[in-house]
């Protein structure tokens, strides 16, 4: 009888635990219940991992196609609508870049299908060096070029990618639901300037060594959080200014940014984490190669950096959230950047400014922008609104050096631009920002 008396309470306790485990999840708690749910937001995503092992992007020394998959690659879309019905679509890609021709084709289709003006489309790439080659030239390859398997694979993949991007953008628009937006930023410390210290005299033992711990960095982790009116977290758009180059193997992977997104999503069913690359043209993750940390592989380093970044995003989402209200305003223009060699035609370079009411200004620049741009733009636009600066957006045409780097020389200065491109680009940022005031 005593044994039965003991078994019954234990059974009841087990039943209660089972009911608790199988019951409704705890009620959502808003991080900022005082902020009006004045937006509509929608998310969608698609796997964009190549279906076959084609050539990889990022490292010129690669001599064969991919051989495996460490992680799926994704395209993700966030659609936002303010109270006046103005919409913005943001697309992030776990890929090397956003070819300008691809961006223009997607923009034209979204305008035709959904009435989204080209200025209200942002496309950003993580710049993972463990993704596929893309067709970077705007025109389709010729029949002769298509005889080359590498060219043919890149073109076929890029065509399929375009269809998936258009599809997820449309799905995100269809998913528009009432939402509350908040933002803030945290810090993450693994990004370091990868250029040598040009202030050291020739002959100094460290004159030609990188990284440069004293070099300029932007280690901010901005995060725009989206939650339902009831307080349930639906997604986050977050950024970091650093190359995705922990890895050098022959497997598909999103690198540290892919793992940061995975970690943010894994314990939140239905949650979408989207990574936006900052001005990381001269920034690398450190440590970043096997042997630097005994017993730790490249993949483990990518995962560790991903965890560090995800932890910073968690802090940015939860610590002192700043309410974001409308209106939504966006401006986009392309400026003409000349090359040193006059026979080379100038390049149309995209500059975009998106203002989220009076709370946040997002500046996006094309291609591999060095960190000087982010630091300068944040300094010059400083005011009541937060300032977030992204690179690798809407274009992929090589490195965009600052005036300082053009003067110093080195890897990031070798693209061949004429001088003063920094003044042209930053000047356009100020013009667009002033237009939206």
Regions of interest found by a model, annotated:
Residues 19-23:
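Boundary at the C-terminal end of the N-terminal hydrophobic targeting segment
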Residues 1-4:
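Positively charged n-region of N-terminal signal peptides that target proteins for export
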Residues 6-7, 24:
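General helical structural elements
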């Amino acid at each position: 009888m005593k044994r039965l008396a003991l078994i019954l309470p234990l059974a009841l306790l087990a039943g209660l635990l089972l009911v608790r485990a199988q019951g409704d999840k705890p009620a959502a708690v808003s991080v900022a219940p005082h902020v009006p749910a004045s937006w509509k937001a929608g998310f969608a995503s698609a796997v964009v991992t190549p279906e076959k092992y084609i050539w990889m992007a990022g490292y010129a020394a690669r001599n064969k196609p991919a051989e495996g998959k460490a992680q799926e690659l994704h395209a993700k879309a966030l659609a936002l609508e303010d109270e006046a019905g103005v919409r913005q679509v943001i697309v992030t890609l776990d890929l090397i870049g956003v070819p300008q021709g691809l961006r223009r084709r997607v923009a034209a289709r979204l305008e035709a299908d959904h009435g989204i003006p080209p200025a209200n489309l942002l496309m950003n790439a993580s710049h993972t060096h463990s993704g596929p080659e893309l067709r970077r030239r705007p025109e389709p390859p010729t029949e002769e070029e298509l005889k080359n398997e590498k060219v043919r694979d890149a073109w076929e993949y890029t065509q399929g990618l375009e269809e998936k991007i258009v599809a997820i953008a449309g799905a995100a628009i269809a998913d528009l639901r009432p939402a509350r937006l908040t933002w803030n930023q945290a810090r993450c410390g693994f990004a370091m300037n990868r250029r040598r210290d040009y202030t050291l005299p020739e002959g100094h033992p460290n004159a030609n060594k990188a990284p440069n711990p004293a070099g300029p960095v932007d280690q901010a982790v901005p995060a725009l959080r989206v939650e339902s009116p009831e307080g349930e977290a639906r997604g986050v758009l977050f950024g970091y200014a650093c190359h995705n180059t922990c890895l050098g193997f022959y497997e598909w992977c999103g690198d540290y940014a892919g793992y940061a997104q995975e970690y943010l999503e894994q314990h939140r069913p239905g949650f979408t984490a989207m990574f936006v690359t900052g001005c990381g043209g001269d920034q690398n993750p450190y440590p970043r190669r096997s042997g630097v940390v005994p017993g730790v592989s490249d993949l483990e380093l990518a995962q560790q950096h991903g965890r560090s970044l995800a932890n910073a995003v968690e802090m940015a989402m939860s610590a002192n959230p700043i309410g974001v209200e409308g209106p939504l305003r966006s401006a986009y223009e392309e400026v003409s950047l000349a090359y040193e060699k006059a026979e080379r035609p100038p390049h149309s370079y995209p500059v975009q400014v998106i203002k989220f009411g009076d709370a946040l200004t997002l500046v996006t620049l094309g291609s591999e922008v060095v960190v000087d741009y982010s630091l300068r733009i944040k300094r010059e636009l400083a005011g009541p609104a937060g300032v977030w600066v992204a690179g690798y957006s809407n274009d992929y045409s090589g490195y965009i050096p600052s005036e300082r780097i053009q003067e110093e020389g080195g890897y990031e200065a070798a693209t061949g631009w004429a001088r003063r491109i920094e003044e042209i680009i930053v000047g356009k940022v100020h013009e667009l920002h002033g237009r939206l005031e």
